[in-house]
Curated annotation (Swiss-Prot):
One of its GO terms (molecular function) is dihydroxy-acid dehydratase activity. HAMAP family: IlvD. Belongs to the IlvD/Edd family. It catalyses: (2R)-2,3-dihydroxy-3-methylbutanoate = 3-methyl-2-oxobutanoate + H2O; (2R,3R)-2,3-dihydroxy-3-methylpentanoate = (S)-3-methyl-2-oxopentanoate + H2O. GO terms for biological process: isoleucine biosynthetic process; L-valine biosynthetic process. The keyword Transport does not apply. Binds 1 [2Fe-2S] cluster per subunit. This cluster acts as a Lewis acid cofactor. Homodimer. Its EC number is 4.2.1.9. This is Dihydroxy-acid dehydratase.
Amino acid sequence: MKSDSMKEGLARAPHRSLLKSIGYTDEEIGRPIIGIVNSANEIVPGHADLNKIARAVKDGVYMAGGTPVEFSTIGVCDGIAMNHIGMKYSLGSRELIADSVEIMATAHAFDALVMIPNCDKIVPGMLMAAARLNLPTIFISGGPMLAGRYPGKPEKKVDLITVFEAVGAVKSGRMAPEELAIIEDAACPTCGSCSGMFTANSMNCLTEAIGMGLPGNGTVPAVMSERVRMAKQAGMRILDLLKNGVTPDKIMTAKAFRNALAVDMALGCSTNTVLHLPAIAHEAGVSISLDLINEISGIAPHLCSLSPAGPNHIEDLNMAGGIQAVLKELARKSGLIDPDCLTVTGRTVGENIASARDADGQVIRTLETPHHAQGGLAVLFGNLAPDGCVVKQSAVVDKMLVHEGPARVFDSEEDATTAIMDGRIKKGDVLVIRYEGPKGGPGMREMLTPTSALAGMGLDSTVALITDGRFSGGSRGAAIGHVSPEAMEGGPIAVVKEGDTITIDIPKKKIGLKLDAGEIQNRLSGWNRPAPKITRGYMARYADQVSSANTGAIFKK
């Protein structure tokens, strides 16, 4: 066992003495040492109840003959960090989480790991660490929040995005402040990751699809006892993975990532998956290009219309059979799902889905009756984004799939939000929010406040928003992010001027600035890089090390 290097033999008497000071017995020290990576805290709704999950995991580890040793990681709530300086720190926390798990697991010679994440950057950060460390690892997430119900109208579901969009509705006079207060109180009724197909749930579902979580990991609600039982099963299962030498490199293969991308497209997941899956794959020695994402989107249909794109929530997907049912439906089409990929169950994808439910035709549509023939995400290229940009095409109204309009240019999210709230944005406009990329932000903030304000004001069907920042999984409309190269790196987005004509053609995967190449080059030759917005601390170091969004915003070294 790896832990023998820190606990066995004469020279390790001091180490054993330290373990005994905590209360571990010789019997416990002699067992496999299983690191329990618990990201619980009291500020993130999806992490507020993770101590209960950790206790269940430890029970499972003990039942299977291991010794669980718990340690913590940080975790940021993107919703609470939204639209202020805090959002600059969210994406950067992904790398910090991966590094901290690597440090703890290596320094203490753990034999295997059980990861307990739930929300946006914690899930990919832990997956990156799992791939890097390549110790036997299993994931058990905290589970999704239940959707809220509008008081007096139990058939009307509400969620966090309902609140964000209601702010814009109040500002435009379309909703009374009293109704906003009612929605605010009703939208988030339980702990858990926010209830739609937003970033956290996207990543939890893809963790299951790629094989690193047990069936149900992505969809069983946080408040259900099934989640606790699953945690115990994960604790027991990790000892089997250790015994059989099943490490992440045997699960997170190139074929498994293709499976995850197919599920991504079927679910209509967050655009943030285009950052996270390549970053995780990079740690696993697998390459995921933007062209591959378009390739799979072209053949994997959009089967589930989940909030913010549709009326259903993760609890509905769970009741319809969850990720295993989605995998089973996709597997009916040759080339979409590789059934031979290994999972943490010890069985293959094909063996797991053999007992899964069939698509119900409503929450999970069949291949013959998809919401859209293509997948939920699309990557666009053109002279405005030579290295690509990303849109959740499943959340764009039909008439905005092709659009041309004048650029309304802003150098920060705050300036753009003020313009929207002040009524200065008109139908047909194309908002350009720049210097919000990985380096320029720094940290590539999510533009959920401006997209929600547009939706709340009824402008999401007539106004596009383009940014080198990114979007929450809760954003909808023609919200095009991850423009690469970013403005801070001298990308063409840096020299867009107020009133320039921008063309968008999502079906053709094109985005352009109606200027000839010579004019764009002339403007770029006169461009000067602005001073960094943060000059000390972690995010200053992050801005120096981070790469472009088109490669997953990973560190260069």
